[in-house]
Each structure stands twice: as structure tokens, then as C-alpha cells.
């Protein structure tokens, strides 16, 4: 075991045979270097895999022809840089001053300083870093998996089988027995089989004696048939086979880990591809909306007049689109180029002017004119380009709870039960005229003004005033006197809480529990629909009702927790959330004065909710309404009858919108429900922590005010939820309206926020 002793000797003693005869001769140096390099790998002790590889490869690489080729190649490469360096093949890496032309470097000096420490190290076995399991080398894995690695096992089995055959007196024909047991035909005849199987009486007695002999000896028949050297060799082979088995296990485990890593990588790739596919679906929907917007422009009279006699290709559904309400237009908004530079999800403009929560708002187009109404009984008109107030709409007595803006026409419904139509182009001039009148009144003697008022009263010329100027003087903005109010519609006996206008037709909902249809051109009410009559006379259920599955609970707000099933919210968010039972809610809905307490908002405030009709919208002859009893009714405007009632909300419905396939509703029961009009059932339920007060949707998203400071945005394609909060409201958002990527919201803090989505 001399080599084993050389394996553990210090590095200095191992380098001495190389450094001392370095200039003697090339052959002597090569032989000594070979002995030093290969000596540690020739011991009989167990060595690491890298040492085995070097031990296997070094004898082949150190042959004379390889050494001569390497020496000549190295000399040819180093002639230009080191012409005088002897034996460059074995030149030490420490840049020792064998070559006077080489200049010392910082690295070489550091190595020279550490020579004593490095030389004192022993030449131990090369150890692999432990990473849970040793990874076998390529050569070791090859040796463990080649077919020849199984030869030793087969040889041992053959040796043991030969001994047993000799002990049993020859083969006993087990293969034939197996074939016959399976019913297979053999090539030999029955006589030959009987002879081979030894069916004769003599053979049977002989095998019986052999079995008795083996039973009595208890395996001692192997003694003397295998030598110690053979047994030791078999033990070494078994150890080698076990090592090969461990190597194969390690290889399989490595492959399993690689397959797992590949599966994870593929899953990650799949997720990215699915996200890309969803993004493409959103782009497809956006292109559909853009195409419809282009077709709408092509159908407009101005474009047709400019085109002259040219016939433009229009779809069959393109006729009449130009007159539809802005709430159903799907085309892209014409936004300035600077809008794309705004960060998304940030409120970039704040409009302060109301001293109470905002109750309604609407605008005609992005960066156009905005109209807001608040509980301070003020209706303001804003310029969205610079955020300046243009003026006010004076005329309603009380709070305006519903309004809509279509181009330059604005319709407002107030607590006085009236609906007023305004021309927004006249607001600025009217404001200037009012300021002029105020200046004249300020210069007039107060006694003269009082005398004039008494004279008007005595003559009966003084009429009931509808608004009050800042100095306390009443001003009556009647149509035709230069006021922006162009028409007043009277008919409701209580507050107008919702309205919808399209193509000269207006539908209003009121707390008097009726829905009225108006002809705006004549100012006449053409149809009245009684909700109480619809409640007491519900439409008959359809003859065949398809089985309804529970709707999928798609979302809980950020503060929600618990079950994600529908059953856990079905009984709970009903009227109990507003402090009333179902019977009490029905009683409030059918009573004379409707009023229920709202659930607390995020800031802890609450109020009495008195808007019996929370939302209305029509399309053609189809009308949808949401009322205080939690019902969503579909009306036929030709007959004035409700032909379907969607039951699901368990608190008053505050807002709704519908298109060709879906109707989306929000309620005080803290849910937003998406109904499938074809099935007449709920397809999705989105539950929040606070009451839903406003919503709007298009083909890609649903935007809602859910009683929190932020505005909730639900992506209908990716089913992802986000919230607009940056530079947002300081109190819960109450109302909102968006067109394309431009959104305006109004909150209980009395301010309006303009967002880039």
C-alpha cells in the first residue's frame, strides 16, 4: 500500500521530485510528473468519482505520442512570447522566474507569498459538494447503465443454478411445465416429454432421495463447491452491483427532478401564453367596438351629406345607430394625444365646488362638458379641459337625483318631481347676464327694490320663484327668457330618482312608484307604468323553466374572507343587511313613503334611502327597471306591462344597465349581479363589503362604486379586479361615468375626480 502513503503526503514533498531535476532532461521530468500526478489515484481505498475519471484517463493521455504532440504544439505557440522558456509543457503556474522576460504580477506575487501555506496542504481525495445527493459523473453513470454491468449478476445466478442442477440430478423441465400449464403446444412429442421430465418410477425415487438429502443437510451441500476466493469475488461483485444500483437510482431521481423542472417551466410558459391570449381577446373586443364606432360615423347624416352620391358599405345593423344614447355607444372615444401620456389608474384632475355629497353626474364626451349635482341643491356645469366651472343650472327646488347629458342637451330630474331640459350652450351667456343683473341690483337703492316688489305683488304679477340669486333676490328661469332651461316636464308627484333618454324619447322613474314615458318634442306623458300594480300582479312563470345552477361567486372585496361559494351569501345579504326583514322590506316598498336605512359605508356613515326606482333603461320597446323591492323588471313599452321579473336581490336595486345579452344590476345588498337575458338567471355574482351605488359596463369591463373610497374595476375577460385609488376620493365614491378609458367619479367628499383608465 505504498501508493496509499504517497496519497496523504504533503504537497511540498510531492513537488520536490518535479522541481529538483527540472533542468536535467525532458524524459526524466515526464516520468516523475506522471508518478506524482497518477500516484494518488492508484490506491486500493475508495476514491471519489472525479479521481476515478482522472485515473482512467491519465494513462491514455500520458502516452508518448500525446506528450510529444502537446509539447510541440505548446512550443510553437510560445515561441513568440517566451522564446527562451525550457519545457513549457510543465511550466509551473506561479510564474516562477525561470523566464527572465516574464514580468511579475500582483497575482503571481500573492501566490509566491502563499507558497508555504499551499505546500503544507495534503493531497486528499477530491470531494464533491453535497447538494442533497451526489450527482454521478458521466463515466460512472455510463458504467452503471451499460448492459455489461448485469453480467456479474447473471454469472452468479448461473453458478448457483449449475450447482442446484447438479444437486438435483439434471434439469427437471420447468419450462415445459410452465408451457403445459398455460396450454401451449410444445415441439416434442408426448413420449419425449415424459422421458425428459423423468416420469419413470426410478427417476421419481432418485429426485425424492435428493430432496431428503437437501432437507437433512440444510444447505450444507454448497460447502466445498465454492472456494473462498469465489465467494469474496461474488461479495465484491454484489457490492459493485449495489453501487451501480444506487447510481441508477440517482440518475432516475435526477431525471425526475429535470422533468419536474421542465413541467414547471412549461406551466409558466402556459400561463404566459394564456395571459397573452386573454390580452388578444381584449384587443379583439376593442376592435369590435372600434368597428361599430366607425360604422356609426359612416351612418351619420353629416358624413353621408359630405360623401354626396357615394354609397358607403354599411352593415345591416348600422342604420339608426347615430341617434342612440351615448350609454350604448361602443365606439372608441376621441381622446387627445396627450391622454396616452397620463399614467393609468391615477386621478389627474379634481373638481371642487360642492359642499355636500354628489348625487348625480354625467358628461357628453371626454374633455367636454360635465354636469354634477349634489345634496347642497346645486347643479354645476364644468369644462373638463381646464377643470373650470362654467356655470350653474338654476330652476329645481331641492336636490337633483338624476341627470343625463347628450351632446348639448342635459336632462335633470329633481326632488320637486319635475324634469327639466337644458341647453348647455346657453349656460355661459346666461351666467354673464346674471352677473350683470346682480351688479345693477347692487347699485339700486334697497328701498326702491322693496317698493317694486310690493307693486308687483299688488298687481298679481309676482310668480312663484324657482331659484335664488346670491344676494337673496329671486330669479325665475322660465323657458324663452334667455335661460338655458328650454322645457319643463311635470307629472310626477314625488322625486324623480332615475331617467334615461334616447332619440327623442324619455323614461323617468319616481318615488311615487311609477315609471313614465315622455315625448320630449311635445312635453307630453305618453305612458305610465305602475310598479305597485306589477308587484301585486306578477307575470306568470314561463311554461318550461330550464334548470338553474347556482351562480358563480366571482369576487369578494379586499376585506372579505371565508367561503367562496354562493350558498353562504344567499340568505345573509338580504334585507337583514339594511336592518329589516323581507316582510318589512316589502311593506316599505308598498307603503306610502318608501324609506329604508342603507348599510354603513366604508367611513361608517349611513342614510335613509328613499329612491324607489333606482335605475331605468330602454332599448327599442324593451324597458328594464330596478326598484326598492329588489326586483328587476322587464317591461313592454307598447303595452305598459311587465312580462318578466328577475328575482335575486334582497335589498333595493340602486343601478342597472343592459345590452343585447346581459343586464348588470347593483343593490344595497352589497352585490353586483350579471344576469343572462337569454336564460333569465344570474350568471355571476360579485359580493362587496359595502352597498353598491353606481355601475356601468362595456364589453371588456364593469366599473362600480361599492361604498369605498376607490372605484372598483372588474375585467370581464381576465376576471381580474382592480381599484382606482391613487389621488382619489377621501370619502366613499358615490357616482361614476366612463367612456372608453376616461372616467369621472363623484364622492361623498363633494368633489369630482377625473381618471385615466
UniProtKB/Swiss-Prot annotation:
The record's SUPFAM superfamilies line, in alphabetical order, gives:
WD40 repeat-like (SSF50978)
The alphabetical list of record keywords is: Coiled coil, Membrane, Mitochondrion, Mitochondrion outer membrane, Repeat, WD repeat
Report each WD repeat as a residue range. 353-394, 396-432, 491-528, 602-645, 648-685, 687-724, 728-757
Segments for region (Disordered): 69-88, 312-336, 454-489, 538-564
Q: Name one GO cellular component term.
A: transferase complex
Q: Which residues form a coiled coil?
A: 225-300
Q: What does this protein do?
A: Involved in mitochondrial fission. Acts as an adapter protein required to form mitochondrial fission complexes. Formation of these complexes is required to promote constriction and fission of the mitochondrial compartment at a late step in mitochondrial division.
> What is the name of the protein in this document?
Mitochondrial division protein 1
- Organism from which the protein derives: Cryptococcus neoformans var. neoformans serotype D (strain JEC21 / ATCC MYA-565) (Filobasidiella neoformans)
Q: In the record, what lineage is assigned to the organism producing the protein?
A: Eukaryota, Fungi, Dikarya, Basidiomycota, Agaricomycotina
Gene name, per UniProt, is MDV1
